[in-house]
From Swiss-Prot:
This is Glutamyl-tRNA(Gln) amidotransferase subunit A. GO terms for cellular component: glutamyl-tRNA(Gln) amidotransferase complex. PROSITE patterns: AMIDASES. It holds the Pfam family Amidase. GO terms for biological process: translation. It comes from Synechococcus sp. (strain RCC307).
């Protein structure tokens, strides 16, 4: 049920938050053995939060804009008193003493947390295969990956285990799993949503955003979590517009740029066909399609895989077995304990990225790799700026392919990294971007359309995505799937 309809039902007495939360927990119990979307199901907290909503309504108090809405929280967001593992052995037993800004705002808005969702370890991956607690399955085909790193959040929404979910996006970790799982995934402008309480991967790239089954629901969640936070020095101190009010504004005359460099060799033919059909759908709604070129777009992935591991190597230096996190036993000295704790606590992919980042930042190579990557990042941002002088939005596929099978890329890191080829540039430039379902391939797997907007233009992004969603009605003729709600 969309958030707007649910809110009406809750307030007119035809439904209760308690009933709604129990339905979500029952759905989780029925599907979780096969789906494995959650690291931790928080049934007691869900019931307590739902009861508080019902009591507020009974007392004629405002329960909040997301009252009773069930939500899954990616397990790299700190939740006070509830384990936050980052799907890593390193933080398997870590219980944060404080609440992240986004979850704090969600609880004040009346949302109900049903659990912490699975992810690639420390958000490093594109499939959830690097999770220390096992891979999440794709609800459309349990024999395929859900994408990553926010695979658990995408899967739980697609499977109807909760209404919405939160993820984090460093190089596509919201949009790519949204594409693979056939849901809406929104990455806001860098700084639009506070990162306070998000376990850091790459601090200049990380951003938090929602998953939902409709664009309107993503707008409703963004409305709550967006806004300045003095605890985050990168948080933007600018007003938050009414995102829901923007959804139905007319889109006639808007210019949509078809980014030529996104339609590359290796793009699955069905993906290209669906995305080009979506562009024509927007043209039929009154948008003007314009071919746009950003020649350095394809340099994004090489740039990212210098900058992100470099920042990760610095951020993950704090896990030394002393202050918190996993501590290895039977070490002969402090230095041996630190080395052993990190070797045993971090998985292979995390260690690989730490090594890459440490190398890129080393004295002999920092100019050749890290500083050069930052220069290319600036050039990519400038190309986007020039593109947005011509058009209002840019359009690409979200991912080059539909969901792949476990193991298909896990032994080939470069092939796995290419899954984020089309999403990474928006992170490098700090742009808002959204993935919306636009079709299915011959195997019944979802395909995602990506739209990108200038900085702080989430209103326009949501507006166009909503009009496309309403006109295309992709899910009306969806194929049957074993775990999809």
């Amino acid at each position: 049920m969309p958030i707007g309809a649910w809110s009406d039902a809750l307030r007119n007495g035809s439904a209760t938050a308690k009933e709604h939360s129990e339905q979500a927990l029952e759905r989780i119990a029925a599907t979780e053995p096969e789906l494995k979307a959650f690291v931790n199901v928080t049934g007691d907290q869900a019931r307590a939060q739902a009861e508080a909503v019902d009591q507020a309504i009974a007392a004629k108090q405002d329960p909040g804009p997301l009252a009773g809405v069930t939500i899954g929280i990616k397990d790299n967001l700190c939740t006070k008193g509830v384990t936050t593992t980052c799907s890593s052995r390193m933080l398997e037993n870590f219980v944060p003493p404080y609440e992240s800004t986004v979850t704090e705002r969600l609880w004040k808005a009346g949302a109900v947390m049903v659990g912490k969702t699975n992810l690639d370890e420390f958000a490093m991956g594109s499939s959830t295969e690097t999770s220390a607690f096992g891979m999440t399955s794709n609800p459309w085909d349990p024999g395929r990956v859900p994408g990553g790193s926010s695979g658990g959040s995408a899967a739980c929404v697609a499977a109807g285990q909760c209404d919405v979910a939160l993820g984090s996006d460093t190089g596509g970790s919201i949009r790519q799993p949204a594409s693979f799982c056939g849901v809406v995934g929104l990455k806001p402008t860098y700084g639009r949503v506070s990162r306070w309480g998000l376990v850091a991967f790459a601090s200049s790239l990380d951003q938090i955003g929602p998953f939902s089954r409709t664009v309107a629901d993503s707008a409703a969640v963004l409305q709550v979590i967006a806004g300045h936070d003095p605890r985050d020095s990168t948080s933007l101190d600018v007003p938050v517009p009414d995102y829901s009010a923007a959804l139905n504004r007319p889109i006639q005359g808007l210019k949509i740029g078809i980014l030529q460099e996104a339609f590359v060799e290796g793009l699955q033919p069905e993906v290209e066909a669906s995305v080009r059909a979506a562009a024509e759908q927007l043209a039929s709604l009154g948008c003007e399609l314009v071919d746009v070129s950003c020649p350095r777009f394809q340099a994004g992935i090489a740039t990212y895989y210098v900058i992100a591991p470099s920042e990760a190597s610095a951020n993950l230096a704090r896990y030394d077995g002393v202050k918190y996190g996993y501590r290895a036993a039977d070490a002969e000295s402090l230095s041996a304990m630190t080395a052993k704790s990190r070797a045993e606590g971090f998985g292979d992919e995390v260690q690989r990225r730490i090594l890459i980042g440490t190398y890129a930042l080393s004295a002999g190579y920092v100019d050749a790799y890290y500083k050069k990557a930052q220069q290319v990042r600036t050039l990519i941002r400038q190309e986007f700026d020039r593109a947005f002088e011509q058009v209002d939005l840019l359009l690409t596929p979200t991912a080059p392919t539909t969901a792949f099978t476990p193991g298909e890329h896990s032994n080939d890191p470069l092939a796995m990294y290419l899954a984020d080829l089309l999403t990474i540039p928006a992170n490098l430039a700090g742009l808002p971007a959204i993935s919306v379902p636009c079709g299915f391939d011959g195997q019944g797997l979802p395909i995602g359309l990506q739209l990108m907007a200038p900085v702080l233009q989430e209103e326009r992004l949501l507006q166009v995505a909503h009009h496309y969603e309403q006109a295309a009605d992709v899910m009306a003729n969806r194929p049957e799937a074993p775990l999809v709600a």
